């Protein structure tokens, strides 16, 4: 891996500012001692941590006691992305069959993908990307 033309991102920090003034950052790093995905969402009242290997979600209110919940819905070996791929396909098929609204709308999915593509554009160009202008350029 160190002697090839590997240009896969191994560490990235994305800073975003939304129209309503809310700021968010995303940090992705490949350098961890565990071969799993973890998610940490920090808010004003506490944080939420998810661990795909352990199939747990921990709620930690600031100044309060942490609560850990089992998130093993599809089982520990639920295929790609901790069962997320199966869940996405299940939700998609239900929507196509007319089974109602999904967990996220097509508009929300498009917006999240545009943010990811804009973050990649910013990484490659080394410049900040304004999302509306980026979307118009596509």
Model-predicted regions and their roles:
Residues 1-4:
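Short, P/G- and charge-enriched loop/turn segments at secondary-structure junctions
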